[in-house]
Structure formats: structure tokens, C-alpha cells
């Protein structure tokens, strides 16, 4: 549903006339017939009725999820209106779950690494979008699988944003791409051991995935 709020919502009661059948309409000025409107009463999710003075006809809803507020008017003689008015309030008190990141490989590779990001839901208003950041750069809306082909270590971060603007925690993974061959720094012939085979000692280094 639409109309989600972040932390709380204030429901204001108004309207109603003392005819025995009128109901609050949430907008009209209170009427004053018969013994007059004494106060409003409201019920939360079908619970007990609670009084609410005309001078401060509000109730604040903070419970997460959907809350149904039902209201009626009570006159000076204690008669409650035969009809009621109902409103639904939607509160999202928490950020979405942290999204998941899947790499095509989490080991060193000389090929392109693909990155898939999946939101893990939101308990209330729902996930509006997921975003990613590469190597600490700006956040970008995620729409399709990412490809990382450049040499080196690359940090992929992801977060989710729900429909009231709350931001999840951040997930991160590192893509490891090594496209540089090892460097041979020295080749030595081992001392002649009297065998017919020659032995060579090779010293090589690789700054990324290693030799």
C-alpha cells in the first residue's frame, strides 16, 4: 500500500454532529446539536475504545506495519455514534535487510568477474531499489549484472533503500582480477652433479595472485 511513514503518524479526528447517527469525517468542523459532542473515541485494530478530548483530537501511531484506527463521537449524555470512521496507517520503523552480493568467483582469476546483487526484502514498506559502489565511488542504482575486467583488487559494496527512504547496512565483497604475468628476475644453472640432465633455478614474482 501507499502512504507509508517512517517513524510515526498522527491521526486527527474531526467532524460529527449530535444526531445519534453521524460519524467523524476526518475533515469537517464538529457540530453542536442536542447535548453536544463531548469527546471522540478511537479503537486500534479492533481493541478497546479510548477517549480523546475535542480540544486535542489526535492519536499518534508508532507501531510498525499496518494499523487500523476506528473513530466515533460521543455526546454529552454519553451516547456513542452509531456509525464509525476508519483509517489505515502504515509505519515503517526499520531499514531494509542488507542485500546479498554474488561474485562469479571469489578467487584470483585472469577473466572478467561478474557481480550480481539481490535485495533481501523489507519487512514493511518494501525495497524501492538497490545501489552499488565500486572501489568507494559514488552510489549507483543497480539494474543488471556488473562486469569487472580491470586488473587488481576491486571492492563492490551494496545497499538497499526502502519506500520511505531508509537505507540498509552495507554488504561488501572483493573481486580479484590478475591480468599481469609473473616477472622472472633470475635464472641459474645448478652446479653440475654429474647427471646428464641440466637443472635450472628460476626466481619469479607476482605482485597479485602470486606464483
Language model regions located:
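Low-complexity, disordered linker/stalk regions enriched in Pro/Thr/Ser/Gly
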Residues: 1-211
Amino acid at each position: 500500500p501507499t502512504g507509508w511513514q517512517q517513524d510515526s503518524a498522527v491521526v486527527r479526528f474531526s467532524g460529527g454532529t449530535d444526531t445519534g447517527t453521524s460519524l467523524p469525517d476526518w475533515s469537517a468542523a464538529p457540530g453542536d446539536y442536542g447535548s453536544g459532542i463531548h469527546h471522540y473515541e478511537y479503537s486500534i485494530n479492533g481493541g478497546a475504545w479510548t477517549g480523546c478530548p475535542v480540544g486535542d483530537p489526535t492519536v499518534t501511531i508508532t507501531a510498525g506495519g499496518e494499523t487500523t484506527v476506528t473513530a466515533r463521537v460521543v455526546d454529552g449524555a454519553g451516547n456513542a455514534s452509531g456509525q464509525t470512521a476508519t483509517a489505515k496507517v502504515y509505519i515503517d520503523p526499520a531499514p531494509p535487510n542488507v542485500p546479498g552480493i554474488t561474485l562469479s568467483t571469489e578467487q584470483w582469476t585472469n577473466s572478467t568477474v561478474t557481480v550480481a546483487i539481490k535485495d533481501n526484502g523489507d519487512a514493511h514498506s518494501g525495497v524501492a531499489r538497490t545501489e552499488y559502489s565500486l572501489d568507494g565511488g559514488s552510489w549507483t542504482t543497480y539494474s543488471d549484472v556488473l562486469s569487472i575486467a580491470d586488473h587488481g583488487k576491486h571492492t563492490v559494496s551494496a545497499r538497499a533503500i526502502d519506500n520511505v527512504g531508509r537505507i540498509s547496512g552495507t554488504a561488501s565483497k572483493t573481486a580479484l582480477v590478475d591480468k599481469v604475468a609473473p616477472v622472472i628476475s633470475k635464472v641459474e644453472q645448478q652446479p653440475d652433479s654429474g647427471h646428464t640432465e641440466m637443472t635450472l633455478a628460476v626466481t619469479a614474482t607476482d605482485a597479485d595472485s602470486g606464483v
